[in-house]
Amino acid sequence: MGVTQVGVNTSFNLVKKIILLVVFSLTLVLLFFYKNHNNKSHIQIGGDFELTNHLGQKTTNDSFNGYHRLVFFGFTNCPDFCPNTLNNIGIVINQIDKKDQLVPIFITVDPERDTVAKLKKYLTNFHPKIIGLTGTNEQIKSVKTKYKIFSKKVMDTKKENGKSNNHNDGRDHGCYGVDHTTIIYLMDKKGVYITHFSPDTNNTDMVKKINQYL
């Protein structure tokens, strides 16, 4: 009888240990997935910057506090994609419900050519709410890093009679274009990343998505 009781106790203890081990393992798995999900929901895009707007005023991330932002990187010598995107952003601004709560921001990836004066002149072609930002090479490099933006100069080797054949105006600092990331970011009122739009997102979908957050 005593032997049987010992056997029962041993089996019970074994089952208890197995249950505790399973519970512990499940806890670790749940913690892993929670941490993973938490990291994904707080994507580190954006942050502090110090640049100059197209009116010559010092501008930081805090300058836009209280407003959602649409942030797009490009350059004024861009032949078609940048102007098309800026035109589309203007259309979106006109169609959203609370347009006074959203600021569209255009940050250059070509600070050598995109001076304050050039940005100001360029932006007269687009929606008046769009704010252009430029800065030194180091300032632009810093803000590109924070927004996960890639850009690279592409030299124009096709020339006729000493003039560039590409669509970029290379008169200022040589003949080159700039390959760059073409994502449009939607940031919240504190400059925290919400979502982004790819180049092929149509205006209707953008308006619908933006209205969800304003």
Which ranges hold each PLM region?
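A short beta-strand-turn-helix
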Residues: 50-69, 93
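Short active-site neighborhood of thiol/selenol oxidoreductases, capturing the structured segment around
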Residues: 61-85, 89
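Structural microenvironment flanking redox-active thiols in thiol-disulfide oxidoreductases
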Residues: 86-145
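Short, internal strand/loop/helix patches
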Residues: 120-181
